Design a protein with these regions (language model features):
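Active-site microenvironment for binding and transforming phosphate-containing groups
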Residues: 1-159
Length: 159
């Protein structure tokens, strides 16, 4: 399953899902092996690379989308200090935050009963924005390279 913040948070009502019901909730409803919470503890989940918590700058609407679903999500957002330069006027701009997308995914997975989560731990090694030699980033490379980024994943069932 691939999801950005909107898919993870369940932003917007689509495909019969209610607000706050994202792709993980939809997967649990549609995938027979994950339909019962008791089955989810045995499923191994792997989080792939994404923009990291030191680079993912978001507005209050993103923070609110997660907090409405789970108030504990507030821990995954760090306010960005917006200090103006000396003598500069302060604009009435909305606050900005650094969001920890891997931690938000792990919270969502834990709430659904998934206990075995590997892969992206939110460290800089997994950040697509700060690792240009390892990962394509549409945010970083889109204007220069177009939207032709590639990602491959292999998923296997183990008996």
């Amino acid at each position: 399953v691939h999801a950005g913040w909107r898919g993870l948070a369940g932003q917007g009502v689509s495909q019969g899902r209610a607000q706050g019901q994202g792709v993980l909730e939809a997967l649990c409803a549609a995938w027979p092996a994950a339909q019962h919470p008791s089955q989810r503890a045995a499923i191994q989940v792997w989080l792939g690379p994404c923009i990291g918590p030191q680079r993912f700058e978001v507005g209050p609407e993103v923070r609110q989308a997660f907090i409405l679903h789970d108030p504990a999500a507030v821990a995954c957002f760090v306010p960005l200090p917006g200090l103006p330069a000396l003598g500069e006027r302060v604009a009435a701009a909305a606050p900005k935050y650094l969001a920890d997308l891997p931690a938000l995914a792990r919270q969502r997975l834990a709430a659904l009963g998934f206990e075995r989560v590997a892969g992206n731990d939110g460290s800089a090694d997994w950040c697509t924005a700060s690792q240009p030699s390892r990962f394509f980033s549409h945010r970083r490379d889109g204007a220069r390279l177009g939207s032709s980024g590639r990602m491959a994943a292999c998923i296997a069932c183990q008996a």
